[in-house]
């Protein structure tokens, strides 16, 4: 029987119980793969990416020993969404003006004119 690929999808975070092999997802019940902002809604700098990746590692470690199921994947994804929102509200992350659809999904940008 083939391994089942579990996934959790939020607006800016996709988690898979898989590993990437030659550009393809291969189900792996012992590994989580993070796909960050697949729609390129934000302009990412290295610091913000590292912050989210570190938070991902912390969450995975905190859930060690718990079942790798849809519920726990959603919890991790929701926590990561919260981390992204914090970066945006702190002005460390910004919306991508060239995004396919600019909908300000995490609220309006914090600019001096809007504060």
UniProtKB/Swiss-Prot annotation:
Keywords: Membrane, NAD, NADP, Plastoquinone, Quinone, Thylakoid, Translocase, Transport
Record field: catalytic activity: a plastoquinone + NADH + (n+1) H(+)(in) = a plastoquinol + NAD(+) + n H(+)(out); a plastoquinone + NADPH + (n+1) H(+)(in) = a plastoquinol + NADP(+) + n H(+)(out)
Membrane topology: Peripheral membrane protein
Keyword Zinc applies: no
Top-rank lineage group of the source organism: Bacteria
Its EC number(s): 7.1.1.-
GO molecular function per UniProt: oxidoreductase activity, acting on NAD(P)H, quinone or similar compound as acceptor; quinone binding
Coiled-coil annotated spans: none
InterPro entries found in the cross-reference section: NdhM (IPR018922)
Compartment(s) of residence: Cellular thylakoid membrane
Pfam families hit by this protein: NdhM
HAMAP family: NDH1_NDH1M (MF_01352)
Function of the molecule: NDH-1 shuttles electrons from an unknown electron donor, via FMN and iron-sulfur (Fe-S) centers, to quinones in the respiratory and/or the photosynthetic chain. The immediate electron acceptor for the enzyme in this species is believed to be plastoquinone. Couples the redox reaction to proton translocation, and thus conserves the redox energy in a proton gradient. Cyanobacterial NDH-1 also plays a role in inorganic carbon-concentration.
Family: Belongs to the complex I NdhM subunit family.
Subunit structure: NDH-1 can be composed of about 15 different subunits; different subcomplexes with different compositions have been identified which probably have different functions.
Name under which the protein is recorded: NAD(P)H-quinone oxidoreductase subunit M
Organism: Synechococcus sp. (strain CC9311)
Gene responsible for this protein: ndhM
